[in-house]
Amino acid sequence: MEPENYLAWLARDIVRNLSYTSLVYNNPKVAIVELLDNKEAFFTYEKEQKTPEALINYIDSIVKSSISVEDKIEALLKIRYISVYVDDKSDKRDIVLQLLNRTIKKIESKTKISNELNDAINAITIESRNWKIQNSESFKPYHYNQLVSDFLKYNEFEILEGTDPLKWKSDTLQGLSPNYNHRTHTLISSIIYATSVRFDNYNDEQLQVLLYLFSIIKTNYVNGYLEILPNRKWSHSLADLRENKSIMMYSAKIIHASCAMISILHAVPIDYFFLAQIIASFSEIPAHAAKQLSSPMTLYIGIAQLRSNIVVSTKIAAESVATESPNISRLEESQLREWEQEMNEYPFQSSRMVRMMKKNIFDVSVDVFYAIFNCFSATFHVGHRIDNPQDAIEAQVKVEYTSDVDKEMYDQYYFLLKRMLTDQLAEYAEEMYFKYNSDVTAESLAAMANSSNGYSRSVTFIDREIKTTKKMLHLDDDLSKNLNFTNIGEQIKKGIPMGTRNVPARQTRGIFILSWQVAAIQHTIAEFLYKKAKKGGFGATFAEAYVSKAATLTYGILAEATSKADQLILYTDVSQWDASQHNTEPYRSAWINAIKEARTKYKINYNQEPVVLGMNVLDKMIEIQEALLNSNLIVESQGSKRQPLRIKYHGVASGEKTTKIGNSFANVALITTVFNNLTNTMPSIRVNHMRVDGDDNVVTMYTANRIDEVQENIKEKYKRMNAKVKALASYTGLEMAKRFIICGKIFERGAISIFTAERPYGTDLSVQSTTGSLIYSAAVNAYRGFGDDYLNFMTDVLVPPSASVKITGRLRSLLSPVTLYSTGPLSFEITPYGLGGRMRLFSLSKENMELYKILTSSLAISIQPDEIKKYSSTPQFKARVDRMISSVQIAMKSEAKIITSILRDKEEQKTLGVPNVATAKNRQQIDKARKTLSLPKEILPKVTKYYPEEIFHLILRNSTLTIPKLNTMTKVYMNNSVNITKLQQQIGVRVSSGIQVHKPINTLLKLVEKHSPIKISPSDLILYSKKYDLTNLNGKKQFLMDLGISGNELRFYLNSKLLFHDLLLSKYDKLYEAPGFGATQLNALPLDLTAAEKVFSIKLNLPNTYYELLMLVLLYEYVNFVMFTGNTFRAVCIPESQTINAKLVKTIMTMIDNIQLDTVMFSDNIF
């Protein structure tokens, strides 16, 4: 075991957070608050105050002293937190300006901007200006980076003044705020800190780019920028802004984007000068730079010829593996001509990414491609583009419809779509009757999210009237007052309110906010269709069939095709899919007539059709389709003087439950129609594989025709259906669902923007938990392409500003890294290397383990707000839950007491979705944690449960360790992390979802799930089993009956003696969830028994269930160990005698019975 690594990490982290503190405050005083052991408990006391430098020297002296490593770790673990006293409250913004000046001076002493960089920046600036002039008619005033005062002068209507001069409103100007979880000056200071500690490692090119970016940051910082303060007020009043002649519209965004480019400067491999070009272009065309600079990738992926290997895959989607043979290269003249023509017309000729692309078409090495690909990912980090909702939605739904279409093709499309839907709906109605006795109320309402219902109305909440838009509260209001909520059609005809979504490099998109009735009606239909698609129905055409455990390798078939180059791969992109003509009348009438036809097919009568709250699901579905065919969209821009807009719309509504799966069906029907018509003129085409995902599609085919002929013909066929498409064809590369598959390798872009966000962060979460999710996103970017140096840099930027908690105006607590990297309201819930959950302790001493458990658990606080309990006893809540309970009882044909209690608990938790309730919960938790910290002398009881790493250490102490042989292997699924690669080389890559040892079968859970309309989790079973006396037959019988199990099933289950086995499995079900192994690059590891046995060989007489649980615990701990230390091993544990064996087995079983697993906010099911 490697305590040295842990010691080095812990000391470095404490020192880093301290030196950052001394950088951003003037003369702070710091004092250690230490833990003292007092047999039963620990108590804390504060030591004398020092300067941060003195404290850093003290920590340094501990690390360099001659005591043992374990004692050094103990000395550092005893630091519970460090109090920081700040007397001089001078403005941090002035300090940041001094730091900026100092940093720029320091870089200038080392280098100056070369002609090469200067030319690159000037050239792209001129090209961006020209592009702006040529495309000016499509620009809105807020797309120009102009003075805010000029914008206000000509666009008064974009603003609403408030009573408080700092509380004015403007949708448009608010869209220009970057939304980060710290103030802009704090971001700059942490970027300066992270670069300063690496200063000696930069090469000349990196220094030049740093100089350029820091100068841009300084210019915008000195000129001033508009920001929204934490108290939700603006930094400037309108009067100030009208007078100010230096604040530009995009200043804050340019600062944040420049900071992002400084972070990507640490990616390996990358073209440094291109990052400067991104900012130069972004300063000129802020709303369009990302899209324009990234666009050549779509074409390049189809023509670049990588040096790679042939990939073979079986017809099982998930199986694919690279062979030794080199891949086959294939590029036709017509493809090169198309590329050259496009590139000659490309407006940004000086883009260094495009220059690299032009040089690298044939025989490209993976490293060069990675550099180009990372440049492409970098363009998205300038942040989210936010347009005014009215302008964006108007552009989104504008489509010219025509009657001049190919009638025959339209008929084919309509009949195909109708036939597919008819078969599905007939099955759906029968399944609901046999499974739930036709009442699907409980399932539909249980799945309903507490999102907006589109408009605000007054409802009673506990003891007060509140105005709210929440679906749940509207539903409760309707039910408790017995209002008529069944004429959905009329409601939709009044108009559909619109929301928006923002993404980097794309225009703002509108989202339809439909009423709760639509969600309730469509839920079971959508679920049924998804389930069918997931099981690989419809010839495994739907991407949903590929999202199960091995999502990572489902693109195996496509990887194989691109490596052999024997099939033509066609990916078509329909622009404005939702509003296209085939999605208007044909799509809606296919749904309506499919329902009518399905009714003639099934064996149940009208009264047995599924119902929700007394409404017939199929009747209402027809009503919804009819209403949506010709709907009015209401688009408001509330933070402006713009009048609400009403727009006539006929397309698909993104906001229905059935949108995505409905799109996939329509897409299959559309492609099939196009190809049926194509084979008349091109009989040599043989379609091999088809995959759709919403409006995305890919088809692979064998053909004797030329590639450009096929492309032209396809476009022409789509045109005859009035669908505007880009049809891209290639033999060796394609893009689907944001993944790029080229010559047998799969790349994912690291395009998660960290320093900007789509919406402002809620005030209800602590800075620590938002920072945790940012570290997680940074880790995903690093694993996908930017590499380990980028992740280290990002933790240095993200952690120090979030490492301290404000206690009073002058006092802050700088938390111990151990507390920060654990779970709870003041923790990141993530490890420094990007795995979700708690940082592990790599130390073998028992005393250190005790200290460590205290530091990780004393702040894990959870509070249930009173309002949840109060609301659950109101008539409004009762109205909803009573309807749901009676629906469960009809569906299960029994009382099902436990199921109905679980239902009530789950519905109670939804009250958290009400504004203020969640905020109250999180604020109370944070306050309690702060109080816990501020008590000077506090007694902390010791933790008696075992942490999983204690089992890991126990096995290691009793094993012989050897260095494993790592297999070198060719990657299909690309990642850029040394340690993930090591893990893959030792335990392999998940190549199939086939022969792994499955999660042991929990028969009890299966029986309950079979009948229960609501989702039941294993922990629910454990909780309720404690309320029954399971030692005698009657207790067991009552428990099972209350779960809704009866008749023969009950008899057989009782006789099978499986109850205790299943309850044990339920207890450890959490082990089958890997906390936050969400980066797909980690999901490519086969986290199962076979993999565990490659690392651990354990010959102990353990019962089978315990053996599996032990192996899983060891495997997760091993993944954490390798990701942290970068070392691998193989462990063999064979006890020398029977006595030792018996003793070990007893200890292990006790530990597993008393294990304490992380409770985390996010986790992934990996089985």
UniProtKB/Swiss-Prot annotation:
Interacts with VP3 (Potential). Interacts with VP2 (Potential). Interacts with NSP5; this interaction is probably necessary for the formation of functional virus factories. The keyword Nucleotide-binding applies. Its main location: virion. This is RNA-directed RNA polymerase. RNA-directed RNA polymerase that is involved in both transcription and genome replication. Together with VP3 capping enzyme, forms an enzyme complex positioned near the channels situated at each of the five-fold vertices of the core. Following infection, the outermost layer of the virus is lost, leaving a double-layered particle (DLP) made up of the core and VP6 shell. VP1 then catalyzes the transcription of fully conservative plus-strand genomic RNAs that are extruded through the DLP's channels into the cytoplasm where they function as mRNAs for translation of viral proteins. One of its GO terms (biological process) is viral genome replication. Keywords: Nucleotide-binding, Nucleotidyltransferase, RNA-binding, RNA-directed RNA polymerase, Transferase, Viral RNA replication, Virion. One of its GO terms (cellular component) is virion component. Its EC number is 2.7.7.48.
